[in-house]
Amino acid sequence: MINIIKSLFAILFLCSCFSASANDECQSCHQKQTSDWKQSDHASSMALANKDTVLGDFSNVTATHFSQKAVFYKEKDAFLVDLTEQGTKKTYTVSYVFGFDPLQQYLIEVEEGKYQVFPFAWDSRPKNQGGQRWYANYANEDVKPNDRLHWLQPLQNWNGMCADCHSDNLKRNYNTE
C-alpha cells in the first residue's frame, strides 16, 4: 500500500513538472519516473495533431450520420475535415487528439481559442475487433444544431467542459465576448 501511495505521488509530481516547464528539471533527477510516465496512458491523453499522434484514417474517407457527412483528409501536415451538416459545408482543421485506445477523439478550434469536440471519433481497435472505423459520438441520435448535445454547443466545448480534468497547468484566456 505504501508503494502505491509513493507511486501516485511520483506520478502527480511528474505530471505537474511536465506541464509546468518544458525543460529537463524534473526529468534529470527522476529518470525512472519519467520513463514510467512516458509509457503511461496519461502521456498520450492529449497531444497536438500530427503524423505521430493522429490514428484516424485521413485518406479522403467519408463518414455519415443522419444529416452529417464528414470527409477526412490531409493537406501537407494538416489533418482536415469537410463537414456538411443540413446542406452547409465547412472545413475544419484538427488541432488536438484525445486518447488513443480504444478510441481517439479530435478537438477542432472553431474560433480563436475555442475548441469543440468533433462529432465523429476514430475506433482505434484492430479491424478484427470491430475497429479501424469512424463512428458518430451519439450513434442513435440525429443531433440538430439547437440540441445541447450538438458538437458546437457548450456541452461539447473543451474550454468549459473538458480542460479542467484533461490538461495540466491550465490558464483560462478564452473570452466569450
Give, region by region, the residue ranges found by the protein language model:
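Short secondary-structure junctions and interdomain/linker hinges
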Residues: 44, 61, 65, 127, ...
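Short Fe-S-cluster ligation motifs
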Residues: 52-74
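Positively charged n-region of N-terminal signal peptides that target proteins for export
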Residues: 1-7
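Short cysteine/histidine-rich metal-coordination sites, predominantly Zn2+-binding motifs
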Residues: 39-49, 177
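Bacterial N-terminal signal peptides
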Residues: 7-17
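Extended surface/linker regions that mediate inter-domain or inter-protein docking
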Residues: 75-177
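Detector for the c-type heme attachment site
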Residues: 23-35, 39, 159-172
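Sec/Tat signal peptide C-region and signal peptidase I cleavage site
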Residues: 18-22
